[in-house]
Amino acid sequence: MVTRILLAAAFAALSISAASAAEPPHGKVTVVFDRPIPNLPGKSMKGVVVEYGPGAASPSHTHPKTAFIYATVLEGSFRIQVKGQPEKIYHVGENFVEEPGSVHLVSANASDTEPARLLAVFVLDTNEKELVTPIKQ
């Protein structure tokens, strides 16, 4: 009986471990700034900090069609690919932009051992509420 319980516990632990390895967790997004732009009626600027744990990634997604995005890496490194561009790794202090209507194919922590953080600044229509829309596969 004890052997069965130990085997069941070991199998459960292996199943959880395998599931975690197969599907890394998604990042955490925190809005740090949200303000209308006074001299651009109908436009706002939103700043978000995106944090990925080791090996974390987000599924392919889009941002609002009105959003121009500037991002700079604050910690670690990010593996990024926007449709029509090659995949690239960005390190601390490096930055990139995403044009309105871009499709974000890859957004991942480039490291399996270190966390990664970036600041993304969106300029977009004030009425846009959802910053990320997953692409249905």
Language model features by range: what are they?
Residues R4-S15:
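Bacterial N-terminal signal peptides
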Residues N127-Q137:
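Short, low-complexity, Pro/Ser/Thr/Gly-rich segments in the mature regions of secreted, periplasmic
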Residues S20-V29:
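Cleaved targeting-peptide boundary
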Residues A57-P59, R79, E94-N109:
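Histidine-centered metal-chelating micro-motifs
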Residues P86-E87, G101-E128:
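Ligand-binding loop in jelly-roll beta-barrel domains
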Residues T30, I37-G42, E51-P54, G84-G101:
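Short acidic-glycine-tyrosine-enriched beta hairpin
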Residues K65-G84, V92-N95:
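Glycine- and acidic-residue-biased ligand/ion/polar-headgroup-sensing regions
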Residues K43, A56-V73:
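A short beta-loop-beta micro-motif enriched in histidine and acidic residues
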